[in-house]
Amino acid sequence: MKKTLQYISIGLIFLISCQDKTGFSGFQNGDIIFQTSKSGQSRAIQIATGSNYSHMGIVYKQENEFFVYEAVQPVKLTPLNDWINRGKNAHYVVKRIKNSEKLLTPEALTKMKQVGEKYAGKDYDLYFEWSDSRIYCSELVWKIYKEAVGLEIGELEELSDFNLTNETVKQKLMERYGDNIPKEELVISPESMFNSDKLITIFEN
């Protein structure tokens, strides 16, 4: 009896400790996760786009562990707990496409991973160009869902649509582009995807 209670106690401690790392135990393949990055450009992205969040990725489960497929340097899979802890205050929001039980079939998820594979190892796109040679976080998620599932999550905008007058933003633009800011460049922002009516919020810690 004592041994049984000990095993139960150990099991409970293990479950609690696992949940404490993420704060959420209901992740599913294909979930989209958002956070505020602590990178040097994060504040500029937030101001320019009017967003609380500056980084995002797609959640996948592999061998009973969850990972985030993300565009950093380079594009790669990152263990979920590491990804969460890397964000500001370990805060994150999980969103899921509507009707995911119908749209995210095993075949669709396989296609998403296949599409994502062609970006694996590519450099992070500091210039936010709409090309496949380099790629940034929201562009990666948008293109995977577009090509694999046929969903356009969020509205494409031009760089000129954002708030480019703030001093923090202007400084970052000068660092990247000098006097040749590509104001007509197509961009998909984390904010646009976060507010898409194709997504529902599953969890926020």
Please describe what each predicted stretch is:
Residues 1-2, 20:
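Generic cytosolic/nucleocytoplasmic N-terminal low-complexity/intrinsically disordered segments
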Residues 2-10:
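Sec-dependent signal peptide recognition
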Residues 11-18:
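Hydrophobic h-region of N-terminal signal peptides that target proteins for export
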Residues 18-205:
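Cysteine-nucleophile amide-bond enzymes
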